[in-house]
UniProtKB/Swiss-Prot annotation:
Its EC number is 3.5.1.18. The lineage of its organism: Bacteria, Pseudomonadati, Pseudomonadota, Gammaproteobacteria, Pseudomonadales. Catalyzes the hydrolysis of N-succinyl-L,L-diaminopimelic acid (SDAP), forming succinate and LL-2,6-diaminopimelate (DAP), an intermediate involved in the bacterial biosynthesis of lysine and meso-diaminopimelic acid, an essential component of bacterial cell walls. GO terms for molecular function: acetylornithine deacetylase activity; cobalt ion binding; succinyl-diaminopimelate desuccinylase activity; zinc ion binding. Zn(2+) 1 binds at residues 68, 102, 165. This is Succinyl-diaminopimelate desuccinylase. Homodimer. The gene is dapE. One of its GO terms (biological process) is diaminopimelate biosynthetic process. SUPFAM superfamilies: Bacterial exopeptidase dimerisation domain (SSF55031), Zn-dependent exopeptidases (SSF53187).
Amino acid sequence: MLSPTLELACDLIRRPSVTPVDAGCQELMMARLANVGFALEQMRIENVDNFWASHGGNDGPVLCFAGHTDVVPTGPLQAWNIPPFDAFIDDQGMLHGRGAADMKGSLAAMLVAAERFVVDYPDHRGSVAFLITSDEEGPAHHGTKAVVERLVARQQRLDWCIVGEPSSTTLVGDIVKNGRRGSLGATLTLRGVQGHVAYPHLAKNPIHLLAPALAELVSEHWDSGNAFFPPTSFQVSNLNSGTGATNVIPGELVAVFNFRFSTESTVESLKSRVAEILDKHSLDWHIDWALSGLPFLTEPGALLDAVASSIKAVTGRDTQASTSGGTSDGRFIATMGTQVVELGPVNATIHQVNECILASDLDVLTEIYYETLIKLLA
C-alpha cells in the first residue's frame, strides 16, 4: 500500500504536463488544499496556469511552499525503460517517471505535509501558503515572476519560502540551496567585411578579429567569489559565422555567451568590462543582453536554521548549504525580501531519460517539510 505522498506523486506524474500545459495537476492540488481550509486564488496569465493558496490569519509570518507542475519534454519515448508518465515503482523501490524528481515528488510531499500540519495545528500562527506555476521549465515570463508582481502590488507579506527543487545529491536532505548565482546572457554580433579568401587585404575576417578578444574574455578574472558563491564564470555556448562556401571570408560573426555571477559582480560591472575588452581590440560590435536573474542569498537565520534542524531530526544528517547549480524560481521570490531555501529529492536523473528517485525519499521529505512547519509556525 502506498503512502499518501506516494499516491499523490504518482497521480501527478501520470498527468503529462509538459511546459506550459498543467494537465489538471493544479486542479488536483487545489481540491486537496480546499478540503483542509485553504483559501485559493487561480491566476491564469496568458497560457500559463498559476495559483496562490493560503491558510491562517493576516497576522504573523508567512511560510510559502513554491513549485512547478510543468515538466521538460520526455525525449525519445523508445529510450525509456518504462513509459515516462506511468509512475511505476520497481522492485528496488525506485519511482520512475518524468517529474518524479523535478518536481512532482516535492509537490506531493509539500501538500501532504501542509494538510497534516493544518489539521494537527488548526490555530497555528501566521500563514501557510502555496505558490504554484506551470511555467518554470520554459520561458518563465507568466509564471512565478508574474505572480510575484501581483503579490507585491497588493503588499502581500512573504517571510519564508521553501522551493521544492531537487537539491539533494546522494541522500535526501544532504544539500539545500540557500541562494543561486545570477545569470546574464549575451548575443554578440561582430561586423567585418566579406570578401574572397584569396584577397584577405580586401576583407575583414570577423573570426580572426574576435579571436584575441575572445581569448581575453575567456581568461579574464571577473571576481574571486566569496564565502557563499564561487567566482563568476564566463562560458561561450555558440559561435556562428561563414556563408557555407569555402572560398568566402564571412562578413559577420555571432557569439552567444553567458555569465553565472556572484554577488561580488553586478550586471553593469560585467557589461562594462566586456565593452572595455572589445573596444580595446577596435572591434565593430553590438550586444543584446538578457538578464535571467540576479544572484540571491539566504544567510543563516530562522528559515535555514529550521530546515537544517528538521533534516537533522528526521534523517540524522547534517545538511550543507550551497549556491551551486542553475537558476530557479527562487530568484523571483527573493525580490520580495523573502528568505528562500530550496529543498527537494536527489537530482541525479533530472531532465534525463528514465528519470527516477527512491520512492521512500518522498516520505522522508514529507517529514522534513512537516517538521519545518512545526518549528516555524506551530
